[in-house]
Amino acid sequence: MSGVTHRGGDLRSYLSSVACFLTLILAGRVTAQTFAVLHNFSATSSDSYTNWDGAQPYQTGLVLSGTSLYGTTLYGGVNGRGTVFSVNTNGNDFTVLHTFSASQSPDYTNLDGEYPQGGLVLLGDTLYGTTLNGGTNSGGYGTLFSLGTNGTGFTAIQSFDSIPNGSNPNGGLVVSGNKIYGTTQESGATNGFGTVFSVNTDGTGLEVLHTFTVTTTNYPYANEDGGEPDSGLILSGDTLYGTAQFIGPYANGTIFSIKTNGADFTVLHTFTAGIGPYNTNADGAFPRAALVLSCGTLYGTASFGGDYDKGVLFSVSTNGSDFKVLHAFTDLDGGRFNLDGAFPTAPLLLLGNTLYGTANVGGVGGNGTVFSLNTGGSGFTVLHSFAATSFGTNSDGMYPECTLALSGNTLYGTTEQGGAYGNGTVFSLFIPPQLTIIPSGPDVILTWPTNYAGFTLQSTTNLGPSAVWTTNSAGPLVVNGQNAVTNSISGTQTFFRLSQ
């Protein structure tokens, strides 16, 4: 090793410039990811689908606050209608914060709702969420609820009524000040297929900002704006961005924006028609997840469509221009197995220039994957492939239909099924640092993030079984949040790794 000084200029400014204009090259092999199951949801009774802790955290992400994770299960609990739970990031202290009650025939009503499917959002010490069904209005069209992070103060702050306010709030919420914004999947009008709404955090002032309606009353339905939004919204300034999973001009869904006062509803992208018996297309179909936003670009997932009708990852500018497919998931062998996963139904997580996400099925075990890729579409990497199941159970879970949460260098998520009892898991996945190489004249600069304690740079000239790895003797220079070591290029091929 030759020290840490870049030849021919200031290293700090050089790293700043190459981070913007060069594609970094992965160097060697980094430490393997560490996967852990934090909680296995317990077995349920065969007749009433009840248990003590909940079952099947379906299409729900975890909310992270300090060392506590908060989430929901669609089923289970003592009434079989779902739960709100908390668990520490080390897997300890799993607590049921609320168990939803069963609705009553013939009008399917209850006081608190049932089947929470849209996940939670945290404001201070208060959690907000939605239930797919139940509530006090006849028909049981779902609720909006709040409760404290300690499980106290549960309140159903709104019961949906189908018309005009919509029904079945299935997506996540976004909170800004004293306002909550969300979507309902159904109704809102006679020919309605869902709404965008706002409501005060105390449940007052419910307002429909937009109703998705169809121009044809028979299937296949058609319109310009889409329908049945299955996802939450994101907020930037006074503009909300979201997806509608179905309908639109080609019946494959849309991406839209709308002002928080309900003005200026705009379709940013219409997903194109499928071709042939497998419904393949160029841009994807059925976007079921919320978007993420960075520097004027939206990133998201479409659960179907693409080259093999197995879903895509995409980006698009906030004005609707420059739509790009970042990754099209590959075909499945035997209807289940591939290398990268298939049918992504959850939002992406953005950290710097890296996107993290989950694919619902596929992978080498056939039960889904956790993946990462760069925002430009390069570097797609499977971080974890969920294991095959035997009679519905396995070691790590199956069907990860979840938004990932990140704390430090660890991702947290849920699986809908699988695990020790077949009812899903809460998991963690440690992500090791990425070692990168920047060519610099006669040298190479090796960098890795400074927030990874205990990792050292090692090198070898032989990758065989007898390889001897030598720890770099010179300490790295810290530049722009990166450890940086400069190494002179010699005639001998050298391999590098990070070791802990």
Predicted feature residues:
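Short, composition-biased motifs enriched in small/polar/acidic residues
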Residues: 5-9, 13-15, 431-500
